[in-house]
UniProtKB/Swiss-Prot annotation:
<keyword id="KW-1015">Disulfide bond</keyword>
<dbReference type="GO" id="GO:0050830">
    <property type="term" value="P:defense response to Gram-positive bacterium"/>
</dbReference>
<dbReference type="GO" id="GO:0002876">
    <property type="term" value="P:positive regulation of chronic inflammatory response to antigenic stimulus"/>
</dbReference>
<feature type="glycosylation site" description="N-linked (GlcNAc...) asparagine">
    <location>
        <position position="95"/>
    </location>
</feature>
<dbReference type="GO" id="GO:0002925">
    <property type="term" value="P:positive regulation of humoral immune response mediated by circulating immunoglobulin"/>
</dbReference>
<feature type="disulfide bond">
    <location>
        <begin position="119"/>
        <end position="155"/>
    </location>
</feature>
<dbReference type="GO" id="GO:0032729">
    <property type="term" value="P:positive regulation of type II interferon production"/>
</dbReference>
<dbReference type="GO" id="GO:0005164">
    <property type="term" value="F:tumor necrosis factor receptor binding"/>
</dbReference>
<dbReference type="GO" id="GO:0007166">
    <property type="term" value="P:cell surface receptor signaling pathway"/>
</dbReference>
<comment type="subunit">
    <text>Homotrimer, and heterotrimer of either two LTB and one LTA subunits or (less prevalent) two LTA and one LTB subunits. Interacts with TNFRSF14.</text>
</comment>
<dbReference type="GO" id="GO:0005615">
    <property type="term" value="C:extracellular space"/>
</dbReference>
<dbReference type="Pfam" id="PF00229">
    <property type="entry name" value="TNF"/>
</dbReference>
<comment type="function">
    <text>Cytokine that in its homotrimeric form binds to TNFRSF1A/TNFR1, TNFRSF1B/TNFBR and TNFRSF14/HVEM. In its heterotrimeric form with LTB binds to TNFRSF3/LTBR. Lymphotoxin is produced by lymphocytes and is cytotoxic for a wide range of tumor cells in vitro and in vivo.</text>
</comment>
<dbReference type="InterPro" id="IPR008983">
    <property type="entry name" value="Tumour_necrosis_fac-like_dom"/>
</dbReference>
<dbReference type="GO" id="GO:0005125">
    <property type="term" value="F:cytokine activity"/>
</dbReference>
<dbReference type="InterPro" id="IPR021184">
    <property type="entry name" value="TNF_CS"/>
</dbReference>
<feature type="signal peptide">
    <location>
        <begin position="1"/>
        <end position="33"/>
    </location>
</feature>
Length: 204
């Protein structure tokens, strides 16, 4: 049998503990420091979750960059397998034309550089015209439609070596299956290097 003095001491010591336990139970769950309790579903999820796969795929937009083939100096042939040229996410190169993989807005661009030894002095010198054009062939238009076009005239002009560059680029609304190609006048004067002659497009 417990002595009366010791029983009274045990009751006195246990009273503060019971009071603290009661106060703790009266607090809301989030204030008790319980993990994941009382938090909204988004806050209770782990922070290392990966984004949905469909969002990651949506960032892979079609793009293409072609360079001129130096092995065909009499005609401008495009290639996509060398010198930082590429085809990505649906673009195809067929019959020297880019095939548009999906409908949407695209930035289309091209550059050519012409060079020559000089204009020969004559009483009536023959003009030398240079031109470069990006064309569209679509099911909506059964013929090649110019998208970008530029012309330059060199002769009569300088007696020494000359260089002329043409860069063009703009945004177009294209349809899946459209074909992008180029037409060039003055191909024997093309300076066929990857940094001088190129053609490409990318989705916005």
């Amino acid at each position: 049998m417990t002595p009366p003095g010791r029983l009274y001491l045990r009751r006195v010591c246990s009273t503060p503990i019971l009071l603290l336990l009661g106060l703790l139970l009266a607090l809301p769950p989030e204030a008790q420091g319980l993990p994941g309790v009382g938090l909204p579903p988004s806050a209770a999820q782990p922070a290392h979750q990966h984004p949905p796969k469909h969002l990651a795929r949506g960032t892979l937009k079609p793009a293409a960059h072609l360079v001129g083939d130096p092995s065909t100096p009499d005609s401008l042939r495009w290639r996509a397998n060398t010198d930082r040229a590429f085809l990505r996410h649906g673009f195809l190169l067929s019959n020297n034309s880019l095939l548009v993989p999906t409908s949407g807005l695209y930035f289309v661009y091209s550059q050519v550089v012409f060079s020559g030894e000089g204009c020969f002095p004559k009483a009536t010198p023959t003009p030398l015209y240079l031109a470069h054009e990006v064309q569209l062939f679509s099911s909506q238009y059964p013929f090649h439609v110019p998208l970008l076009s530029a012309q330059k005239s060199v002769c009569p002009g300088p007696q020494g070596p000359w260089v002329r560059s043409v860069y063009q680029g703009a945004v177009f609304l294209l349809t899946q299956g459209d074909q992008l190609s180029t037409h060039t006048d003055g191909t024997p004067h093309l300076l066929l290097s990857p940094s001088s002659v190129f053609f490409g497009a990318f989705a916005l």
